[in-house]
């Protein structure tokens, strides 16, 4: 009985162990199945087709030690274009600290307090300072201050600042050879007189600050001296206070807005000139005043489009409408290129150089009107055409300087130079009158004791 009972008990225990083993095997296999599925899925993602559209498994990327980025709400839609432009203009003026534009109902613009009795006060100053004469050697020519400049900010175009540097170097070369003082300005002295008009407050300031300067010579930054030997016939203008390049018939008969050009002009340091600046300036404040005068000039001057007032049109308007007041003291020069238009000049430099100076008609100043060297684009001409023309003008002028030292550009289209004269051990200007004049001008010679 016991054996039977014992055998039954033994068989029951074995059955229980089998059932327990089956239950344990099933529960232990479940995690293994999950692991296998994950491994297969991972292998599928790595090795399987990437372009399948029937099966997509989200990719999970765990990144450690990186900042947490919090999603933000989408920005509001932009305002209408007109509102954006108004906001941009307002913001620009606030950022730069400019005053609001002068309105037509505001008092007329003024350069400052009216200066009276200037000629007498200047004469007294010159008498008290004989070490700063208004006339200098050679031949007692007038003391001249050449004035130029550019905007205070860097150029938007990376090449622009380089072009301005070369243009200034050109002016320094000419002034050094001819004994002229030079002033380079990079500040807007009056926020209302921007753009073309910035020269007016500058000229007034320099006149009263430098009574020793008999003449102020304004030269635009994009005007290049291209005849480094040419000397202005100073005595021709002894009784005139303003010298402009242009044509009298175009100004007084045709009333053309391009009858003269203000890119390069001479103005005498005297009361008459201060009065002219005072009459000239009220047409230049930025904003509605400048726009209104631009419309007036378009009506009164032939060929002028109705854009905002520029200083050149304003001066011509004064000369035409107030000729009795200003005309007698204005000399309009056309016998040489005090302000030559670049487009008809820059491709003829080689021809001019081959012909030499027999006719004495090399272009004195080449002015790149319509080109803006500081901008990425030009006003009226392709930017590349302007850049190429300026490069040729710089090199044509620079060759006249390099020649003094025995070098020249390989061509006017490159900055590369070559030696054109062997050194002999003698002074470079020995036996060469032209070189002697440039290297050792008479105004630099010590006076005999």
Swiss-Prot record:
InterPro entries: Glyco_trans_34, Nucleotide-diphossugar_trans. Residues 1-28 are cytoplasmic. It is found in: Golgi apparatus membrane. Glycans are attached at residues 89, 413, 422. GO terms for cellular component: Golgi membrane. Keywords: Glycoprotein, Glycosyltransferase, Golgi apparatus, Membrane, Signal-anchor, Transferase, Transmembrane, Transmembrane helix. Residues 1-14 have a biased composition (Basic and acidic residues). It is a single-pass type II membrane protein. Its EC number is 2.4.-.-. The chain crosses the membrane at residues 29-49. It comes from the Eukaryota. GO terms for biological process: xyloglucan biosynthetic process. One of its GO terms (molecular function) is UDP-xylosyltransferase activity. Pfam families: Glyco_transf_34. Induction: Down-regulated by treatment with atrazine. Probable glycosyltransferase that may be involved in the biosynthesis of xyloglucan. Belongs to the glycosyltransferase 34 family. This is Probable glycosyltransferase 5. It comes from Oryza sativa subsp. japonica (Rice).
